[in-house]
């Protein structure tokens, strides 16, 4: 059975369910069930050292002609990856506190009672955070990453691997290490009602986080592992200055979680702090028609539109798309006169901020 399973798993990674069934005459046959709503389609069968796309035709299986295989791939790609279903992941895998926080306090809209499963599933399907499958409602990739309590259970690549090194190269003797995982967004204090009727206080960047998500945890890791210099100004005021502008660091982290290629499994985002620089490395090349030159100019394009939309609601992402030129490039120039490196290298994208 294991050998058979290995012969039908596509290299992209589907996970057939193995079982058995008793038929007439007391014979037992092996049953292999392929998930109908897997992330990576079409399925392939192994023939020798090659993988062959096959389709069902009535009660038989046949090889798909090149044109049909191309059509199957095209149909799979039409749906953005962050809107695809995650088999096995459901409503119970979400942090209900964050969901209420998002719809009630961030979006300022009514939401179902916490125990109203059907109401929540319908709302989340309507907002693409869940997907209706053939047999059940499942989380979308974006829904799991944004609000999932343990996204790595289903998506091993859902996290940030952070390390702080004493020198300018990677070292086994790191000063600090942390695997950062959980929901991308923080849990924020509920919005307060204004003293003036019909004028609620809207969610903003100044809203207080009461439980950090991945983005804030990553920024906290940076704060703990860089220095802050303090001095007394001529007018007697205490002045402070971090090694790096935190707004630029935050923008680099947000861009990584919003735009990385989540189809590349297992590989986390890398956040590395060296003696002379900070590096944020995102798996995957730049999305769509984006180039480094276009990024510097503020070109707007996204690989994970659902994730970006929700992060924009939380004010993590600028609606103008000018986060890179304004916060990273201009921010580093103003801070220490350095020019940040934006590098597309093989199957990864690197943002490098220099200490100066």
Regions found by a protein language model. Give the residues of each.
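Divalent-cation
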Residues: 1-51, 56-59
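A short glycine-rich, hydrophobically flanked beta-strand micro-motif that places a catalytic Asp/Glu
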Residues: 16-19, 255, 264-272
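Short, surface-exposed charged micro-motifs
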Residues: 20, 161, 268-270, 339-341
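Active-site helix-to-loop segments that bind/position phosphate- or nucleotide-bearing substrates
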Residues: 54-266, 289, 293-300, 315, ...
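Conserved glycine-centered short motifs in functionally critical loops
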Residues: 265-291, 298-310, 314, 322, ...
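Glycine-rich ATP-binding loops of the HATPase_c
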Residues: 318, 337-343
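Short C-terminal beta-strand
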Residues: 347-355
């Amino acid at each position: 059975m294991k050998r058979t399973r290995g012969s039908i798993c596509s290299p992209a990674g589907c996970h057939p369910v193995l079982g058995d069934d008793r038929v007439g005459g007391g014979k037992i046959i092996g049953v292999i069930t392929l998930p109908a709503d897997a992330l990576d389609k079409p399925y392939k069968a192994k023939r020798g050292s090659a993988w062959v796309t096959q389709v069902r035709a009535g009660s038989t299986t046949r090889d798909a002609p090149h044109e049909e295989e191309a059509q199957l791939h095209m149909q799979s790609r039409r749906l953005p990856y962050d809107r695809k279903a995650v088999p096995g992941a459901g409503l119970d895998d979400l942090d209900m506190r964050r969901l209420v926080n998002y719809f009630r306090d961030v979006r300022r809209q009514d939401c179902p009672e916490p125990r109203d499963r059907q109401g929540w599933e319908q709302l989340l399907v309507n907002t693409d955070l869940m997907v209706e499958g053939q047999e059940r409602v499942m989380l979308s990739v974006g829904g799991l990453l944004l609000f999932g309590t343990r996204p790595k259970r289903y998506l091993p690549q859902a996290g940030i691997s952070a390390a702080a090194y004493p020198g300018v190269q990677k070292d086994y003797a790191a000063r600090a290490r942390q695997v950062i995982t959980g929901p991308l967004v923080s849990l924020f204090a509920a919005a307060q009602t204004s003293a003036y009727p019909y004028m609620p206080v809207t969610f903003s960047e100044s809203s207080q986080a009461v439980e950090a998500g991945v983005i804030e945890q990553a920024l906290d890791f940076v704060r703990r592992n860089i220095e802050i210099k303090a001095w007394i100004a001529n007018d007697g005021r205490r002045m402070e200055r971090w090694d790096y502008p935190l707004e630029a660091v935050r923008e680099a982290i947000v861009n990584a979680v919003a735009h990385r290629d989540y189809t590349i499994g297992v590989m986390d985002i890398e956040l590395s702090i060296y003696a002379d620089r900070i590096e944020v490395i995102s798996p995957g090349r730049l999305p769509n028609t984006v180039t480094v030159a276009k990024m510097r100019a503020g070109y707007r394009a996204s690989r994970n539109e659902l994730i970006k939309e929700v992060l924009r609601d939380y004010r993590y992402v600028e609606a103008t798309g000018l986060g890179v030129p304004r916060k990273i490039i201009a921010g580093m120039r103003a801070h220490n006169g350095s020019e940040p490196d934006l590098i597309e290298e093989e199957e990864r994208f690197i943002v490098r901020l220099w200490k100066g």
